[in-house]
Amino acid sequence: MYKNIYIVADVEGVAGLVFYEYWDKEMSLLNHELLRRNRVLLTEEVNAAARGAFAAGAEKVVVHDHHGAGYTIIPELMDERLELIHGRGEQHLFLGTSHPDLDQGFDALLLIGMHAKAGTAEGCTPHSYIQVETAAGQTYALSEATMSMAIAGDCGIPCAFIAGDRATVEDALSLCPGMHSLATKKNYASQLTRTISPILSRKLIESGVEAALRQDRLQPFKITGPCKVRIGDRNPQVLWPEKPETCASFSEALIATLRNVPWYKPVSEIDDGWRFPDRRQVTPPTQWNIPPTGEKQP
């Protein structure tokens, strides 16, 4: 039986979301409302997953807020039995992992609010592209969802359930066909979707998670190393590395590559705590290793 459950939560794949709040720091009431409602939508889907897990006999459920600056889930609206990992993503690198404590005795991974990888024609706000090449000649194109599945696989942990847009759910099921899933919306384009009701989504997540955690144990999705990782991004400061570092495991290779992404370069392991963590305040451009030709990654 699955006793200790780890949830990774993103926001773009929740039912009812079709685009973010505005990114120009506009301080309008509309922008405030967009951000507030998206946070509520995610928090309630996480609560639904927690209810399903506890109904299936879980003893501990921890959720990692993995969207943006890691401050999207609203703590005061959380199920009281949940524990929350939140905060600045770049400081994970000092721990050597993208998901803190995942290797500390957890039995199953749940994915909530997942979105499709960059380049997906029918994905809601698709972004992030992680390319993996193994020494054995295998290649993978991962989304953030399947990336989390692979990190869990390095810890021997299976992914039991995923909720998100249809494109990312189908992508994840192609790698782990036995897990339970919920497609919260069908996407026509990056900001045009047909969504189910958030109320229905929460009901289906709760029942789906309970069913998933009552089934026989699945095999983890594991990428066999050694391997190397490249990260694609339309931001020209994120280079497509010519010779990424080869590491023994996927998780190690991912961390090695993330250390070269501009906004994943924290100034200090121990920050002074008096600066609001605006992720746009990154290393000055003069310190970025941009090729003289100005070439961008594919």
Enumerate the language-model features and the residues they cover.
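A solvent-exposed, charged loop/short amphipathic helix patch at secondary-structure junctions
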Residues: 19-37, 127-137
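Active-site rim beta-loop-alpha module in soluble metabolic enzymes
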Residues: 151-212
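Acidic, His- and aromatic-enriched active-site or binding-groove loops in soluble protein domains
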Residues: 80-96, 134, 141, 179-190
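Glycine-rich nucleotide/cofactor/substrate-binding loop typically near the N-terminus or early
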Residues: 16-21, 33, 40, 44-104
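Short beta-strand segments
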Residues: 8-9, 64-65, 109-114, 162-163, ...
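C-terminal accessory domains and tails appended to enzymatic cores
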Residues: 201-298
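N-terminal glycine-rich anion-binding loops that anchor highly charged ligand groups
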Residues: 3-27, 38-42
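Active-site glycine-rich loop that binds ribose-phosphate moieties when present
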Residues: 92-94, 129-155, 163-167
